[in-house]
Amino acid sequence: MKNYRTYTYLSFLNIIFFMTPFTSAHSLEDAINSQDRSPKNVARDQYRNPYKTLSFFEIKQDMKIVELSPGSGWYTEILANYIHSPGMLTAAHFDKNSDRDFYIRMRNNFEKKINENPMYKNVSIVDLSSKLADRETLDAVLTFRNLH
């Protein structure tokens, strides 16, 4: 009888496991508090209030988002940990072929950051001047701290 109960229990768990949609366990708080974030960026949380900001914009894990001019990727660190399939995160950065050294340096540093950490495996990068996406396919376009 004991083996019957064990098999029944394991079968039940197996059904639950395979019928449950695969979603991230990460909440927005988990993404903000992730160990993957740089300590330098975490130190600025108290001033930038990422939880309040992203909650205000009603950003959800399954959204398709374009982040305009992500700079060095402060918000990208959080969004990359939070946005999961079927959602997507596209970073629209300075053009690779710009004639401005600053733009090229910023883009190269951002690409290096994205390519060196598996946390960013689902982040795509496009040129800011290119067609970012069809309007109908996006849930949000975000821009932070770059309009002065």
Segments from the language model and where they lie:
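S-adenosyl-L-methionine
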Residues: 103-130
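Bacterial N-terminal signal peptides that target proteins for export
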Residues: 2-12
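Conserved class I S-adenosyl-L-methionine
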Residues: 61-71
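A conserved beta-strand element that flanks and buttresses the S-adenosyl-L-methionine
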Residues: 142-146
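Class I SAM-dependent methyltransferase Rossmann-like catalytic core
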Residues: 28-56, 60
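A short acidic, Gly/Pro-enriched loop at the edge of an enzyme's catalytic core
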Residues: 131-141
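Glycine-rich SAM-binding Motif I of class I
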Residues: 73-77
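Bacterial N-terminal signal peptides
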Residues: 10-20
